[in-house]
A protein has these predicted regions:
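Conserved N-terminal substructure of TIR/SEFIR domains
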Residues: 1-63, 74, 83-91, 97
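Short alpha-helix boundary/capping motifs
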Residues: 56, 110-111
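Short glycine-/small-residue-rich Rossmann-like dinucleotide-binding loops
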Residues: 66
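Switch/connector loops and helix/strand junctions flanking conserved nucleotide-binding motifs
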Residues: 71-73, 101-109
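Active-site phosphate/pyrophosphate- and oxyanion-stabilizing loops and adjacent acidic/basic residues
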Residues: 80
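Acidic, Ser/Thr-rich peripheral helices and adjacent loops at domain boundaries
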Residues: 114-117
Length: 117
């Protein structure tokens, strides 16, 4: 599934994240860029963990960071798989939404706690 021309998008389903991802997906695909999203490309009864592990191997990864994303164990698993691969800073393009309260250190700790619980 992963090759040098794929762009993976990691996001929490629903709300503003989904709207933004739908727009990005349509725009990138109209330019001939293959976009991979779990909601569409995983398939019925697909192996979600195997699919998530592929995220880190894409040519580029767009991460739409929202409050919901930061509180989701599945999204955090995707982020860990992305981070396990080299050239992270050259291949990952974050989009931070307004509800993701990550700029205050105390609030970042709250996100860590919500995923670990």
């Amino acid at each position: 599934m992963a090759n040098n021309n794929n762009v993976f998008i990691s996001y929490a389903w629903g709300g503003e994240s989904e709207r933004i991802v739908n727009e990005l997906d349509a725009d990138l695909q109209s330019k001939g860029i293959l976009v991979i999203r779990d909601k569409r490309d995983l398939g019925f009864k697909g192996m979600i963990r195997d699919f998530m592990r592929q995220f880190g191997h894409g040519h580029a990864v767009i991460v739409v960071i929202s409050d919901k994303y930061l509180k989701s164990p599945n999204c955090m698993f995707e982020l860990v798989e992305i981070a396990r691969n080299k050239d992270l800073y050259d291949r990952v393009f974050p989009i931070v939404l307004g509800d993701a309260d990550i700029y205050d250190p105390v609030n970042r700790i709250k996100y860590i706690g919500s995923v670990l619980i």
